[in-house]
Swiss-Prot record:
Annotated PANTHER family: EXODEOXYRIBONUCLEASE 7 SMALL SUBUNIT (PTHR34137:SF1)
Keywords: Cytoplasm, Exonuclease, Hydrolase, Nuclease
Source organism (scientific name): Shigella sonnei (strain Ss046)
Similarity annotation: Belongs to the XseB family.
Protein name from the UniProt record: Exodeoxyribonuclease 7 small subunit
HAMAP family for the chain: Exonuc_7_S
One BP annotation, GO: DNA catabolic process
């Protein structure tokens, strides 16, 4: 497992780590301090994942903008 402040190597690894954190938090077995640390790491991973998704979306838009015949509907995240 990567160090707490280290970014995972890929989006998929970050997502996997985030899922593990959620499972541990949902178990309710963690001491308060450890749960807070896990929650903090989870927030970091979620933000990093969101940033990677936004970068991927921008790349797709750039690639599609090279082809003027292709239109891309605006992206609207479900949570907004």
């Amino acid at each position: 497992m990567p160090k707490k402040n280290e970014a995972p190597a890929s989006f998929e690894k970050a997502l996997s780590e985030l899922e593990q954190i959620v499972t541990r938090l949902e178990s309710g077995d963690l001491p308060l301090e450890e749960a807070l640390n896990e929650f903090e790491r989870g927030v970091q991973l979620a933000r990093q994942g969101q940033a990677k998704l936004q970068q991927a979306e921008q790349r797709v838009q750039i690639l599609l903008s090279d082809n003027e015949d292709t239109s891309l509907p605006p992206f609207t995240p479900d949570n907004e």
